[in-house]
Swiss-Prot record:
SUPFAM superfamilies, per the entry: Aspartate/ornithine carbamoyltransferase
The family this protein is said to belong to: Belongs to the aspartate/ornithine carbamoyltransferase superfamily. OTCase family.
Superkingdom of origin organism: Bacteria
One GO-annotated biological process of the protein: arginine biosynthetic process via ornithine
The encoding gene: argI
Record's protein name: Ornithine carbamoyltransferase
Length: 335
């Protein structure tokens, strides 16, 4: 029986550094098998519930395709497709679905919801995203970084994350860096730094793994020598418009553009983004942002960077599939 069998995947700190590497190795193997057409199905006969309280493209598609590739079946429960938290408690929903399904994915709001599902379902529960953490995204990020710097181990890599570092991506990057011993720089105005107690706890773990976690407002200092630059959207569509103006004004200096890439001093620096990205005006929201806030070349990242050879965002997006598949296979297959 493998070490992950019947375990949950709720946040990265539930795992050891060696276990994170093992999941990445499994994802690499599964990706290779899929590309070569020799993938072995280990989840035949399994049924999976996908609970989405927030809309999704990459996460939903990754879970569905990964399940189909492995011979499993899925039921999609969208934002209006279940009674969870409305007419039925999370606890009761967990106990019902746990009787019918072999695994449950949850993408929604509070971390406490996915933790309650895990406590009462009796089957593996996976966190597809909460307000606090996005662990499946970080597995894909780490796999992508390994692929693009094959001669460097993760504990020798440097990543700078620019923008609003208080969100689920900032939190999960802190956990990932602490676990694998990476040099992580969070580059943002102090108003957008993560909770201090959480940062201190991750820094303490990083000291044990050989990692380094730095928070700075200085862009040049933060990106110097970085192997990877990472950013995410500055505003969420559920937030009031008043917040947009304040946030964009605050974060505009932290836009990832060619000047910032040059400040790394690394001509081979790569750009990461968990997507979707506001890099042009080809979407309704993107056009609105460009016109209203004078951002013709993109918001958190410019079109020039996004479409450049530095950008590996679509490799990163593809790797959501392979890493999510690894999590499902590891937690639902005995072998």
């Amino acid at each position: 029986m493998n070490q992950f069998y019947k375990r949950h995947f709720l946040r990265l700190l539930d795992f050891t550094p060696a276990e994170i590497i093992a999941l990445l190795d499994l994802a690499t193997e599964l990706k290779k098998d899929k590309k070569s057409g020799c993938e072995q199905q280990k989840l035949v006969g399994k049924n999976i519930a996908l609970i989405f309280e927030k809309d999704s493209t990459r996460t939903r598609c990754s879970f569905e395709v990964a399940a189909y590739d492995q011979g499993a079946r899925v039921t999609y429960l969208g934002p209006g497709g279940s009674q969870i938290g409305h007419k039925e408690s999370i606890k009761d929903t967990a106990r019902v679905l746990g009787r019918m399904y072999d695994g449950i994915q949850y993408r929604g709001y509070g971390q406490r919801v996915v933790e309650t599902l895990a406590e009462f379902a009796g089957v593996p529960v996976w966190n597809g995203l909460t307000n606090e953490f996005h662990p499946t995204q970080l597995l894909a990020d780490l796999l992508t970084m390994r692929e693009h710097l094959p001669n460097k181990s993760l504990n020798k890599m440097t990543l700078a994350y620019l923008g609003d570092t208080r969100n689920n991506m900032g939190n999960s990057l802190l956990e990932a860096a602490a676990l694998v011993g990476m040099d992580l720089r969070l580059v943002a105005p102090k108003a957008c730094w993560p909770e201090e107690a959480f940062v201190i706890s991750c820094q303490a773990l990083a000291q044990k793994t050989g990692g380094k976690i730095t928070l700075t407002e200085d862009i040049a200092e933060g990106v110097n020598g970085a192997d990877f630059l990472y950013t995410d959207v500055w505003v969420s569509m559920g937030e009031p418009k008043e917040v947009w103006q304040e946030r964009i004004t605050l974060l505009k200096p932290y836009q990832v553009n060619m000047r910032v890439l040059a400040l790394t001093g690394n001509p081979q620096v790569k750009f990461l983004h968990c997507l979707p990205a506001f890099h042009d005006d080809q979407t309704t929201i993107g056009k609105q942002m460009a016109e209203q806030y004078d951002l013709p070349g993109g918001m958190e990242v410019t079109e020039e960077v996004f479409e450049s050879a530095h950008s590996i965002v679509f490799d990163q997006a593809e790797n959501r599939l392979h890493t999510i598949k690894a999590v499902m296979v590891a937690t639902m297959s005995k072998i």
